[in-house]
Amino acid sequence: MATDAALRRLLRLHRTEIAVAVDSAFPLLHALADHDVVPEDKFQETLHLKEKEGCPQAFHALLSWLLTQDSTAILDFWRVLFKDYNLERYGRLQPILDSFPKDVDLSQPRKGRKPPAVPKALVPPPRLPTKRKASEEARAAAPAALTPRGTASPGSQLKAKPPKKPESSAEQQRLPLGNGIQTMSASVQRAVAMSSGDVPGARGAVEGILIQQVFESGGSKKCIQVGGEFYTPSKFEDSGSGKNKARSSSGPKPLVRAKGAQGAAPGGGEARLGQQGSVPAPLALPSDPQLHQKNEDECAVCRDGGELICCDGCPRAFHLACLSPPLREIPSGTWRCSSCLQATVQEVQPRAEEPRPQEPPVETPLPPGLRSAGEEVRGPPGEPLAGMDTTLVYKHLPAPPSAAPLPGLDSSALHPLLCVGPEGQQNLAPGARCGVCGDGTDVLRCTHCAAAFHWRCHFPAGTSRPGTGLRCRSCSGDVTPAPVEGVLAPSPARLAPGPAKDDTASHEPALHRDDLESLLSEHTFDGILQWAIQSMARPAAPFPS
C-alpha cells in the first residue's frame, strides 16, 4: 500500500512536467487506451480538448482525472509512460525517469485483475516427451532406412525435435514416396531470407527453406517451407494477385516470377515468392504464353542484366529505361513488347498496309463565274458528264502521292514587283535580260507579267512606243484588265490570243505604286508568288513575221 501511495504522490508531483513534455497525443494517449488505462469516452474527450486548448492542457486534465482513479490504473499509467517508444518520442520524460525513486517497483503485478481460476479438471495434462508427430517419426526413421544393415542408430531415437504444425505433416504425407527413400531425409534444404510481405500472414523476417524433394521417378519438385506451411509454385500462382515480372539476372529463371524482395541462396540459386494482392489474376487467353516460359537473363536492347521486365509473348526481357518510350513502373497484367504487338497487328490485319485503290474524281456542277483562275492549267483533262457543259464542271481530284516541287524562279523576276518607280515604270533589277536577244542593256519591264524585254525585239515593225503602261509582245494582246486593288490578275493562259489592236485602245492601265502597295498589304506573299508563277508559266508568243 505504501507503493500505491508513493505512485499517486509522484503523479501529483510530476503532473505538470509530464503534461508539458507530451507535445502530441500519439503515441501516449493511444497506448493508454490500448492498455485499458483510459476508457473510450475519456479518450475522445481528451482529443477534443487537445484540438481546442492544446496538448499540454488536455493531458493535464487527463492526469487530474487519473488521480481520482484506483491505484491499479495509476500503476498501469506509469508502466505505459516509461515504455521505450514513449521515451524516444518525448525526450523530456527521461529526467522524470531518472529522478524516479529506486525503491518504487513498477514491475509488480496488478491488483484486482487476476485471471479467473481454472478448474484442475479442465487443465490439459502435460505432453510426454516420447510423444511425437508422424513427421518427427519419419525424420527419425530416415537414418535407419539408409544404414547398411537397416538398424536404427540409438542417437536418432533419443534426439527430440521441436513440434511443428499439423499442416506440415499432412503436406508431407501427400508427397509420394518410393523405394524406401524418405522425403525429408533425402531433401536438400537451403535457407533463404525473405521479407514478410511475400508470404500471407507472416510478420517480420521469416525463413524460407528451399527444399528439393526426391521422388521415385528421379525428378525433383521445388517448394518453400515457411514455418509449417509448404508453398509450391502452383500455390504461389493461385494465391498471388498480379503477375509480377521484375527479376534479377543472376541464376536461372525460376518457376515463379516475383517483384518483391529477393534473397540469393547459397550456391547461386534464388527463391522468389509471389507478391500478394487484392486484384484477382487475369484469365489466361488462348494466345497467352505459358506461365513457365523462360525469358532471357539480360536486356534485349543493351545486353546487360539487372532489374528486367519480361515479355509475355517472347523470351526477351528489357530494362524499363531501355523501352521506347521508357516506363516508370512495371505495368500490371499481361505485358508484351513492341515486336509482339506489331506481329499481332499484322496477323489480325495482314492487308492493312496495302495502298487503297484510287477513287475516281467526283465531278460537281458549279454555276458560271465560280471557277478559280488557272483551273484548266492545274487540272488534268477528263471526260465531262453526259449532257453537261464543260465550263460548268468542277472536278474534285484526290490528293497526289507527293507534291511536285515548284519550278525554280529567278530572283530578278520577282524583284520588280517590289521596285516600282515614281513614274509608274518599274525599276530594273541587276542581271535582267531580254528573252529574245539575251542582252540586258536598256531593257524594259512589262507592267503585266514583269518580264524584261526590248521594244525593238518584241515590236520590230516600228510600232509606236507608249509613254506609260508598257507591255511585252505576249501581253500586248491581253484584254484582261490590270490588277486593281484587292483583286489578283487571272492567268492569261485561260484566254485565247486575239489579233493586235490599237495600242491606245488595247492597253489597260498599268500597275501603279498605290495599287501594288494595296496588293501587298491585303494579300500574303504566297498569293503574289502564285500570281507570278502563273504569269511566267505561259509559252512564249511567236515572233511577228
Swiss-Prot record:
CDD domains with a match to the protein in the record: PHD1_AIRE (cd15539), PHD2_AIRE (cd15540)
Annotated spans, Interaction with histone H3 not methylated at 'Lys-4': 295-298, 304-312, 331-335
The protein's name in its UniProt record: Autoimmune regulator
Recorded consequence of changing residue 305 to S: Found in a patient with pernicious anemia and neuropathy; uncertain significance; no effect on doted nuclear localization; dominant-negative effect on regulation of target gene transcription
Summary of the tissues where the protein is detected: Widely expressed. Expressed at higher level in thymus (medullary epithelial cells and monocyte-dendritic cells), pancreas, adrenal cortex and testis. Expressed at lower level in the spleen, fetal liver and lymph nodes. In secondary lymphoid organs, expressed in a discrete population of bone marrow-derived toleregenic antigen presenting cells (APCs) called extrathymic AIRE expressing cells (eTAC)(at protein level). Isoform 2 and isoform 3 seem to be less frequently expressed than isoform 1, if at all.
Ranges where the record places region Disordered: 101-178, 234-290, 348-382, 489-508
Gene this chain is encoded by: AIRE
Chain span(s) of sequence motif LXXLL motif 2: 63-67
Matches recorded under Pfam families: HSR (PF03172), PHD (PF00628), SAND (PF01342)
Result after altering residue 302 to P: Reduces transcriptional activation
Disease as annotated in the protein's UniProt record: Autoimmune polyendocrine syndrome 1, with or without reversible metaphyseal dysplasia: A rare disease characterized by the combination of chronic mucocutaneous candidiasis, hypoparathyroidism and Addison disease. Symptoms of mucocutaneous candidiasis manifest first, followed by hypotension or fatigue occurring as a result of Addison disease. APS1 is associated with other autoimmune disorders including diabetes mellitus, vitiligo, alopecia, hepatitis, pernicious anemia and primary hypothyroidism.
